[in-house]
Amino acid sequence: MGRIIGIDLGTTNSCVAVLDGGKARVIENAEGDRTTPSVIAYTQDGETLVGQPAKRQAVTNPTNTVFAIKRLIGRRFEDEEVQRDIGIMPFKIVKADNGDAWVEAGGEKRAAPQISAEILKKMKKTAEDFLGEAVTEAVITVPAYFNDSQRQATKDAGRIAGLEVKRIINEPTAAALAYGMDKNRGENIVAVYDLGGGTFDLSIIEIDEVEGEHTFEVLATNGDTHLGGEDFDNRVINYLVAEFKKDQGLDLKTDPLAMQRVKEAAEKAKIELSSAQSTEVNLPYVTADATGPKHMNVKLTRAKLESLVEDLVTKSIEPLKRALADADLSVSDINDIILVGGQTRMPLVQKTVAEFFGKEPRKDVNPDEAVAVGAAIQGGVLAGDVKDVLLLDVSPLSLGIETMGSVMTALIEKNTTIPTKKSQTFSTAEDNQSAVTIHVLQGERKRSSDNKSLGQFNLEGIRPAQRGTPQIEVTFDVDADGILHVSAKDKDTGKEQKITIQASSGLSDEEVEQMIRDAEAHAEDDKKFEELVATRNQADAMVHGTRKQIEEAGDALPSEDKEAIEAAVVDLETAIKSDKKDEIEAKTQALAEKSQKLMEIAQAKAQQGSADAGEQQQSAKQDDDVVDAEFEEVKDDK
């Protein structure tokens, strides 16, 4: 078995590590750097450049130089943040035939996993040059808050790069592995604050020593899949462009070459201000007009930078609070804070985190390399080179299906330890229903349309029967990569249908954030909706039951009573279609009152049936050949 390498596939930079002599080692690339810019360029002569060479030529080839591709992976073109990125990216983001967000560069339309694969190929080659052998297996990291589609798309990128992805591991969990492997202090609860180039994650992880086994258990995770260093850069870019327009009266946003230079200068200024109090952005000949060349000269202080990005830093605090609440912990329960991701080098970020937790974050973790190191350790665990390490990660969002009344019924709750498998039995909503549609959802809301649709499939060939009779077993299986597999089985016929949720779309920043925020802010709305659905279902059952009783009563029910009851049934059916709970309840009550005669007929028939049964029993007692039998009453749970 060959070595399993660990790859941190980052938005801004990527990193590769491998277990070497029992220790995880970060590998330097061909340029001698320990991290590689996640930049890909397609040149005029058909060459593909990756990393520093691609970044160096970006100024002269902005429309064919792709960066921050991780922000598009597993996403739909129509997603709000994709639309937002279209306005600021110099390269062209286009809509693929399947609705995904693709990139047009080098005269071709390319999928995000395809472009990401170029970075992974570079990481693979870097490892092969160091090890002197072929590498075919890898552990790749993703943000903890990546959804099913984004994880699938990342695995696809690995496959395109010629790698068998042995495991997808969450970035904060990988960082905790890197930090905790050499710590033998018993129970230790750490908060991993991971603010990278394009994503933000927060995980609460318990590191413990149990009977000689190192356990890393994720207690809760939260985050924002569209918040990172790129957003900080964009604030600086917008400020520089606005200052230049104020000074020169020219809008640089119409000039791709100028914008690429401004982007590089903004990133450089942001980094410099982590150690300096002020810096100057000097870009001679940044553009020109009829009067001649124009130069940019803008002074930027740390205080100004902090005022530009303060709300972005504050935005990261809400997920912290939610993760602590989900883990049922308070700030005082956290022993250590680990900062991961290049953006955490910013003093304002460090200060904000320290103020929230009431203690300074640890300084002994390299924010750029910890994730790749953790991935390499996990690779060692999978290869059997690292013993006595148990990693318990979680599913970041609830997973379920749409049930009667457009309700999201969760089979796997958020923050459930993975891998996990859960089955639940459902039934049909109509008489003689021969097929059911299994609609798979991800999110925290009760109403199915308020959650993210991951996919749907049909289970056909169900034997005709009364509603509520067929037994359909739905099974959700989340593997160690956090990828969902769903199956539905008709217990009667044994027919089964399976689906692995395909990477057809990604969760938008707005969708993911809103799912949990809305679930909290609209708890009252959700409760009212649940009550409305319960009332509707109860009324629907009454309509169905009443119609059946009318049929069974036959001629025993006077025609005038029958007409009155049928009119009440129609009234209730009309009410069920509305959103007025009180009206549905009133019409249900009206039908119950009108159906009094039906009840009397049903009771009379039941009494007659009991009398007949009594006579048969008496007759049976007189028979010498008596057989005792046990019976069990089975009630349908509708």
From Swiss-Prot:
The modification Phosphothreonine is found at T199. Pfam families: HSP70. CDD domains: ASKHA_NBD_HSP70_DnaK-like. Coiled coil: none annotated. It comes from the Bacteria. Gene3D superfamilies: 1.20.1270.10, 3.30.420.40, Actin, Chain A, domain 4, Substrate Binding Domain Of DNAk, Chain A, domain 1. SUPFAM superfamilies: Actin-like ATPase domain, Heat shock protein 70kD (HSP70), C-terminal subdomain, Heat shock protein 70kD (HSP70), peptide-binding domain. Residues 625-638 have a biased composition (Acidic residues). Residues 605-620 have a biased composition (Polar residues). Induction: By stress conditions e.g. heat shock. Residues 602-638 are annotated as: Disordered. Keywords: ATP-binding, Chaperone, Nucleotide-binding, Phosphoprotein, Stress response. One of its GO terms (molecular function) is ATP-dependent protein folding chaperone. The keyword Transport does not apply. Acts as a chaperone. Belongs to the heat shock protein 70 family. This is Chaperone protein DnaK. It comes from Pseudoalteromonas translucida (strain TAC 125). The lineage of its organism: Bacteria, Pseudomonadati, Pseudomonadota, Gammaproteobacteria, Alteromonadales. The gene is dnaK.
